[in-house]
Amino acid sequence: MILGAVFYIVFIALFFGIAVGIIFAIKSIKLI
C-alpha cells in the first residue's frame, strides 16, 4: 500500500514536471 502511494506520487510528479517543461519550452520558442 505504501509502495503504491509512493509510485502514484512519483508518477504525478513526473507528469507535472513534463507538462511544465513543455509549457516552458513553448513559451521560450514564442519569445524567440
From Swiss-Prot:
InterPro entries xref list: Cyt_b6/f_cplx_su6 (IPR007802)
Localization of this protein: Cellular thylakoid membrane
Alphabetized GO MF terms: electron transporter, transferring electrons within cytochrome b6/f complex of photosystem II activity
Membrane topology of the entry: Single-pass membrane protein
SUPFAM superfamilies in alphabetical order: PetL subunit of the cytochrome b6f complex
Family: Belongs to the PetL family.
Name of the protein described by the UniProt record: Cytochrome b6-f complex subunit 6
Gene for this chain: petL
